[in-house]
Amino acid sequence: MNFEEAEDINGVRFAWNAFPSTKAEAGKIVVPTGALYTPLKQREDLPIAAYDPVYCSNQSCKSILNPYCAVDPNGFWRCPLCQGRNSLPAHYHGINAENLPLELQNTSSTVEYITARPVQNPPIFTFVIDLCQDEENLKALIEDVIVSFNYLPPNALVGLITYGTMVQVHDLGSEKINKSYIFRGDKEYTDKQISDMLNRPVAPVLNQQQQQQQQQQPLQQQQQLANSLTRFFLPLEDVEFQLTSLLEGLNRDPWAVANGARPLRSTGSALNVAISLLGLTFPGFGARVMLFAAGPGTLNPGLIVGNQLKEPIRSHSDIDKDNAKHFKKAAKFYDALAAKAVKNCHTVDIFAGCYDQIGLLEMKNLCNNTGGTMLLSDAFTTSIFKRSFLRLFNKDEEGYLLMGFNGTFEIRTSKELKVSGLIGNASSLGVKTSNVSENELGIGGSSHYRLCSTSPRHTYAVFFDVANTQQLPPTAQSYIQFITHYQHSSGTYRIRVTTVSNYLTSDEQSLTNSFDQEAAAVIMARVTIFKSEQDDGADVLRWVDRMLIRLCQKFADYRKDQEESFRLGPQFQLYPQFIYYLRRSQFLQVFNNSPDETAFYRHVLLTEDANNSLIMIQPTLTSFTLDGEPEAVLLDSVSIKDDRILLLDTFFHILIFHGKTISAWRKAKYQEQEEYANFKQLLDEPKQEAAELLADRYPLPRFIDTEEGGSQARFLYSKLNPSVTYNTNEMIGGPGMGGAGGAIVLTDDVSLQVFMSHLQKLVVSGSS
C-alpha cells in the first residue's frame, strides 16, 4: 500500500512510516516523526457504528476497542496501547473470527460512532455585518447572506449584529417592529455589562422535564424567560421572513465620513459583543460568528489604523521595525477574544470584501485557534467571495452540513511514543497525560485539543517523540489512536476513531524506505511557519537551510569533499526542491505581500492536507500543444515556449498562459475558422481543466487568463525556477523571450540548479 492509499483509508500521512527504535536515533533523523491527520476525511465506505464505543478500563489509557486488539474466547480483550486486559460487554460475548463486531474488523482502522447522547441545541450562526461600505458592495453581501439561508438546517439558530460607528444587536424575537440594542463602538464591554444592557439574565438550557415544568409556571415567569438573551438567536424556520426583510432594509452606516478620513468602524467592539453574547447564551454548543468586514477597524477596542487617511496602515516593515503603533494592542485584544471563543467552543469566520487590509494579521488567532475560515476578496461582489462563502455550507449525500462543531481531539499512544505537540487550527486543552513529551513542538504540553470547528478539509500536523531508550526486537510495533469527538449537524454527537500501527526499527535502510518526502515537506513547512510567527525571517530561513543540509548529510551517498559524488535515493530526491520552492514561497518571502495576505496564505496552509499543501509550496505546471497530449512540465523558465499553452495551479491562483505564437493566432481569431478546429480545441483544453480545478477548491482561486508580455504574466514568472535570467550566459534560445531555451526571468533569485550546487558543496564538506 502506498502512502496516498493509506491516507485515503485513514486520513493519516506520516513523514516516516517507521519510527527510530530509540530516542537517540530519533534525534538524528532531522525531519520530525510527525503525521498529517484529517479527522473527518471523507470515505464512501466509512464504517459507521450506531452505538457507543468500548473503552480501555485503564484510566491513564482510555483507548477505544480497535482491530489491533487481541480478543480471547473468555470475553476479554487486550489493549495494544497499554497492554491492559479488559472485559468485553456482555453483548460481545461469543464473538469469533467469523462474527466480529464492526470495530474489530480489519477494515475498521477508522470508524465513526454515532453516540446515544443527544445534542441539546442545533448549530448557531451569528452574522456580523459591516455597514461602512458602498451600497453596491453591501447589497451584494446581503443577497449572498440571504441565499445562505437555503443551505442552513431549518432548525439552526440565527442571530444578526450590524456595525458601523455603533454596534446594533438585532432582537429577532420582536415580531411587530424591528427592535435593536445599540452599543458604543469605542467601548469594550464586559460580559456582565452586555447582559445587563440587554436587560435580562441568561436563560438556562432546559431538558424535556424542565420544559414541561416551565409550561406550568405563571405567565409572568414565562414572559421573563421570553425576554432572555436567547431571543437574539432564534430558529431560522421561525424568523427567516423577518430576518430577510431586516437584511433587505439595511443601509450604509449613516455616520458622516469627513474628507481625508476613513469611516469610523467598530469591528473590535462588534466582535466583542458577538462573542460575549454567544458565550453568555450558548456556552459549550456549536456556534459560528461570521464577520463580514469591508475595511479596517478605526475605533478602539481593536483599532487597526487611525481614521485619518494620512496615517498609512502598517506594513511588514513597520511591524519588523516596531513602528506599527497599534499592532501589539490590537493583537492582544483579538487574542483575548479568541481565547473566550475557544473556551465556549465557538468558531469565528472572517470574510474580507475590500481592497484595503482589514487587520487579518491582528485577528488571525480568531480563526486559527477556533478552526474558522479566513477569506480575502477584493469586494463582496466578486465570484471569489460569493462562491467561496456558499461552499462553506457544502453538504454530504444525506443533506447534512460538512462541518463538525464543538469538537475535541485526543491522541493516545503506546509506551514507545509521546506527544510533542500539534500545528494546525486548534487550541490546547492543557491535558498533560502520561504520554505527553517534555520536548514541545508546535502547540505542546497536552494530548487533548479543542476543535471548535472541523471539516473534511481540516488537517492537523501531530508530532511524536520516541520515548524508548533501549533497543527493541525487529518486530516491535508502536500504536497511535486519534479520537475526535464532535457535534454533527444532524443533531448527534459522534466519535471518529483512527488507530494505526508503525514498526520501530534501528535499521537505517528501513527508515529510508519509509520516508514520505511529500508529507515531510508539508510537515516541515508547518514547522517553519510556526517558527516564523515567533522568530526573525532571516533566522528561520537559515534554520530551514541547516535542516536540509543535516538531512542530506545523514541520508545522501557521497564521498567527503567530492561534490560530483553526491547522490540522493529516490525517497529523498524531490525533497530539496520542495524546500527550495518553500524558501521562495509567499509563506516565507513576504516582501510583495501585505501582512493580511501573509496571514491568509499561512492560515490556508495550516488547514489543508498534504496534496493541496504541496501545490501551494511547489505549484503544478501543465503544458498543452497542438501535436501532443497535455503533460506535466518543469516549474521552470525553460518550460515557456512560443507554441505552448501553460496551466499553472498555485492553489490560490489558476493561470492560463499563452505562448507568443499561440497568442498571435488567438488575436488573429484562427479559432473561429472551421479549418482550425484543432486550434480551437487546444484553446479549450486548459479552460476545461481549469474549470475542474475551480469546481471543488476552497477558497475559490483567482482565475487569470494571460499571454506572453501580458501584465499578469508576472504571476507565472514569480513561481518559475529562474534557470535563465537576465544575468546568465547559459541561454540556449538567444536573447529573445520564449525561444527554444525558454524565457528570461528578470530576477536576482538563485536558481534551483545553483541552490542544489551549493547544497552539495556544503554537504560533502561537512559544513552545517
Swiss-Prot record:
Transport recorded as keyword: yes
Q: Which SUPFAM superfamilies match?
A: beta-sandwich domain of Sec23/24, C-terminal, gelsolin-like domain of Sec23/24, Helical domain of Sec23/24, vWA-like, Zn-finger domain of Sec23/24
**Bilayer topology term:** Peripheral membrane protein
**Keywords tagged on the record:** Cytoplasm, Cytoplasmic vesicle, Endoplasmic reticulum, ER-Golgi transport, Golgi apparatus, Membrane, Metal-binding, Protein transport, Transport, Zinc
Top-rank taxon: Eukaryota
Gene3D superfamilies, per database record: beta-sandwich domain of Sec23/24, Sec23/Sec24 helical domain, Severin, von Willebrand factor, type A domain, Zn-finger domain of Sec23/24
| Localization (cell) | Cytoplasm; Cytoplasmic vesicle, COPII-coated vesicle membrane; Endoplasmic reticulum membrane; Golgi apparatus membrane
Name one process (GO BP) from the record. Answer: COPII-coated vesicle cargo loading
Task: Please name the GO terms that the record assigns under molecular function.
Answer: GTPase activator activity; zinc ion binding
Any one GO CC term of the record: endoplasmic reticulum exit site
Q: Where does Zn(2+) bind?
A: 56, 61, 79, 82
Q: Does the keyword Aminoacyl-tRNA synthetase apply?
A: no
- Family classification: Belongs to the SEC23/SEC24 family. SEC23 subfamily.
Quaternary organization: The COPII coat is composed of at least 5 proteins: the SEC23/24 complex, the SEC13/31 complex, and the protein SAR1.
What function does the entry list?
A: Component of the coat protein complex II (COPII) which promotes the formation of transport vesicles from the endoplasmic reticulum (ER). The coat has two main functions, the physical deformation of the endoplasmic reticulum membrane into vesicles and the selection of cargo molecules.
In Swiss-Prot or TrEMBL terms, this protein is called Protein transport protein SEC23
Give the source species: Lodderomyces elongisporus (strain ATCC 11503 / CBS 2605 / JCM 1781 / NBRC 1676 / NRRL YB-4239)
Gene field: SEC23
